[in-house]
């Protein structure tokens, strides 16, 4: 069964070193479980690296059995079985049974061909899975009223073809598991990722982390871990919540007026940066004790959103942020995620071609 875990990484710009390029490819395909930043060019190559350079890259279509591959990299047959299973699932290597040995070849006869084949499979399978996800997402123009933050995270996704439905579960549970949203050590009875995905998919407005935790009766840290995975997959995005600014500004104004007084509000509190009439209305409302959230919202209506953010910040508050599905419907999400996948696959193909070229020198 096809299973692939992709991690987008900066290109090894200009490098023609086979070792550097191959380790970059191995890390991008998550074939070795380690932190990419923990490896540098002075470290000893991984066992998988030694296996590729000692066999499959030298003679990709010769047909190598597991014992020969193990001899190249110094791994036991059990360890090699696990490595080859992962390579077959990722689509880099194909195998056939000859006699009592499984014979392995690099697909397509070169690293570039193998990665291109892998990319075609990955895109089609992800398209199928995103179509399943699209069925959960309700159409909503309102959801996208506010511009998203200009932040792009490193793309990280698990792609797996549809697996069998788990006993006592439904297809959504299988989808969450196959996309890796339950985490690597998720328990079978844990459906938090499913509940969060459904909650966001059915919402017309961004939802804060705190609100999600309260609605689902879960700890904030557990909810945050699932949110991080959804962000890395580009399914959701973080967005400012301007409709909450008036509420937070009001609370900060009242707190700071009681603690520091009018002069501080006008000077260091930021009211002095606003139009004089706006400042007077706010101060007057505080003194007369008739200021409310609705009045603050009306007073700040003509103030640019960036200046509202600045005011909240100088008053000691923080801009409220929430999370939303990153599109008005399922089709937009599908296109968004596939575009990120296409970019990652293009990088993989470019590096794979460089690996092939470096071997010819």
List each model region and its residues.
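Short alpha-helical segments that sit at the start of domains
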Residues: 10-51, 156-195
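Short helix-capping/hinge SLiMs at alpha-helix to coil transitions
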Residues: 42, 56-62, 86, 200-205, ...
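Short acidic, hydrophobic short linear motifs in intrinsically disordered regions
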Residues: 60-72, 203-215
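Short amphipathic alpha-helical interaction segments
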Residues: 74-89, 217-232, 238
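DNA-contacting interfaces and partner/effector-binding or oligomerization modules
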Residues: 85-89, 97, 107-112, 116-117, ...
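Short, Lys/Arg-rich nucleic-acid/phosphate-binding segment
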Residues: 97-104, 108-109, 240-252, 314-321
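Amphipathic alpha-helical dimerization/coiled-coil segments
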Residues: 113-160, 260-361
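Internal, charge-rich low-complexity segments
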Residues: 220-285
